[in-house]
Regions:
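Short conserved beta-strand and strand-loop elements enriched in small hydrophobics
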Residues: 18-24, 54-67
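Extended Gly/Ser/Thr-rich low-complexity repeat segments
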Residues: 56-62, 95-105
Length: 108
């Protein structure tokens, strides 16, 4: 990853697949997907039907527990997926994600 991307993102992303449930405003049921990379500040979710940039989302990331994340779509790649920026997480969820990422980095 180049330095400008790291600076723009704020934290390095790891190639890791994590199941995710995606909720949009007014949705009765979640969409299900998986991350292709993940960091403390965001992720990339693969999807053939990506959301438009600016779409607010609520995510449930399935790590050892379930993390609840409020997020916003920052990139939209047709037939590929979305870049997601995390905008709000509970402190304990941040710590669980940090621990998960540290352990994942050791195995890569």
């Amino acid at each position: 990853m180049s330095a400008p991307e790291n600076e723009r993102r704020g934290s390095a992303r790891l190639k890791v697949r994590v199941p995710v449930e995606i909720y949009t405003e007014g949705s009765a049921a979640p969409l299900r997907g998986a991350t292709s990379d993940l960091s403390l500040s965001g992720c990339y979710i693969e999807s053939i039907f990506p959301f438009p940039v600016g779409t607010p989302l609520e995510l449930k990331l399935q790590l050892e527990g379930t993390l609840l994340v409020v997020a916003t779509v920052v990139t939209s790649d047709p037939q590929v997926g979305n870049g997601i920026h995390f905008t709000r997480m509970l402190p304990e969820d941040i710590e669980e994600l940090r621990t998960f990422l540290e352990n994942a980095e050791k195995t890569q």
